[in-house]
C-alpha cells in the first residue's frame, strides 16, 4: 500500500511537471535539458557496469545537453538572432574528441566505449532534442511560434496508451506480445491501449476544429505513437535484460529511473517528427 501511494504521488508530480513545462517555452527547454542530462548520466552509468566498458559520463552528458540547447537555438528565435547551423560545431568537436580520446586511454575494449558513447547521443540526446522541432513551428510569414499541443500530445498519447494497455491487459490479456523480452505485455492490452489513444486523438481533433491537423491525421499520429512507443518500451526492456537489471535507476520513487519513464518517448518522438514531416510533403 505504501509503495502504491509513493508511486501515485510520484506519477502525479511527474505528469504535472511535464504538462506545466509546455505552458512556457523557457520551462520546456529547462525541464527537458535536465531530463536529457539525467537520462544520459543514468545510461552511461549502467553501461559502465559492464566489463571492459568505460564511457566518459561527464563529457557524454554535457554533449547531450549541449545538443538539446543547440537544437533549441536552431529551431527558434527566442534567444535572439537567426538560427545558425554553426551552433552545432562545438558538439561535433566534442564527439570527435570522445572518439579520438580512445586512442590514448588504452582501454581494454575501445569499440564498446565508442558504441555506447554514440548510442547515448543517438538513443537519448537526439530524440529529446527533436522535441524542439515539434515545439517551435514557423508560420507562413516566417515567424516562429511556440506550439504547446504537438509535443504535449505525444506524451498524452503515451500516457493514455500505458493506462489503457494496463487496464485492458489486466482484464483480458491472454496472448503474450513479446514473452522473451516483456512477459507482462499482451496483444489484448496493446490493442486496447491503441483504441484508447484513437479516442483521445478524436477528442483532440474535435476540440481543435482541424486548425492544426485533420481528424484522420491526429488519429494517424496517435497510431504512430502507440506503435513506436511500444517498440521503445520493448527496446529498453531488452537493454535492461541484457544488463541484468530490473530498473534503470531509482531517481523516481516507485517508478524506477529516467529510462524507465521515458523509454517509449525515445522512439515515439522521432517517429512523430517523421510522420508530421511526411504529412507536410503532401
What are these regions (language model features)?
Residues 274-282:
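Juxtamembrane boundary at the C-terminal end of a transmembrane helix
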Residues 169-171, 240-243, 266, 271:
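Re-entrant/interfacial helical elements at transmembrane boundaries that shape
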Residues 100, 231-247:
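Transmembrane alpha-helical segments of integral membrane proteins
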Residues 213-218, 255-256, 262, 281-282:
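Short, conserved aromatic-histidine micro-motifs
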Residues 242-264:
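Interfacial loop-to-transmembrane junctions
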Residues 1-224:
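Membrane-embedded alpha-helical bundles of polytopic integral membrane proteins
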Residues 10, 165-166, 185-197, 229-232, ...:
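Alpha-helical transmembrane segments that form the membrane-embedded catalytic/substrate-binding core
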Amino acid at each position: 500500500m505504501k509503495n502504491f501511494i509513493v508511486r501515485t504521488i510520484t506519477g502525479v508530480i511527474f505528469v504535472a511537471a511535464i504538462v506545466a513545462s509546455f505552458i512556457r517555452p523557457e520551462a520546456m527547454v529547462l525541464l527537458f535539458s535536465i531530463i536529457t542530462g539525467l537520462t544520459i548520466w543514468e545510461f552511461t552509468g549502467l553501461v559502465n557496469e559492464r566489463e571492459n566498458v568505460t564511457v566518459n559520463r561527464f563529457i557524454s552528458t554535457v554533449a547531450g545537453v549541449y545538443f538539446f540547447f543547440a537544437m533549441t537555438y536552431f529551431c527558434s528565435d527566442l534567444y535572439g538572432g537567426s538560427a545558425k547551423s554553426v551552433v552545432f560545431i562545438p558538439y561535433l568537436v566534442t564527439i570527435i574528441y570522445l572518439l579520438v580520446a580512445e586512442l590514448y586511454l588504452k582501454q581494454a575494449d575501445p569499440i564498446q566505449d565508442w558504441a555506447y558513447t554514440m548510442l547515448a547521443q543517438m538513443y537519448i540526446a537526439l530524440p529529446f532534442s527533436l522535441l524542439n522541432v515539434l515545439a517551435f513551428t514557423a508560420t507562413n510569414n516566417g515567424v516562429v511560434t511556440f506550439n504547446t499541443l504537438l509535443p504535449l500530445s505525444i506524451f498524452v498519447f503515451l500516457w493514455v496508451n500505458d493506462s489503457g494497455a494496463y487496464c485492458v491487459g489486466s482484464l483480458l490479456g491472454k496472448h503474450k506480445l513479446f514473452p522473451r523480452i516483456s512477459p507482462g505485455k499482451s496483444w489484448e492490452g496493446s490493442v486496447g491501449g491503441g483504441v484508447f489513444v484513437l479516442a483521445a486523438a478524436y477528442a483532440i481533433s474535435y476540440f481543435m476544429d482541424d486548425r492544426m491537423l485533420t481528424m484522420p491525421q491526429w488519429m494517424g499520429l496517435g497510431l504512430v505513437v502507440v506503435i513506436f512507443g511500444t517498440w521503445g518500451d520493448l527496446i529498453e526492456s531488452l537493454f535492461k535484460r541484457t544488463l541484468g537489471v530490473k530498473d534503470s535507476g531509482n531517481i523516481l520513487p516507485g517508478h524506477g529511473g529516467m529510462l524507465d519513464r521515458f523509454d517509449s518517448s525515445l522512439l515515439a518522438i522521432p517517429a512523430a517528427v517523421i510522420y508530421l514531416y511526411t504529412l507536410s510533403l503532401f
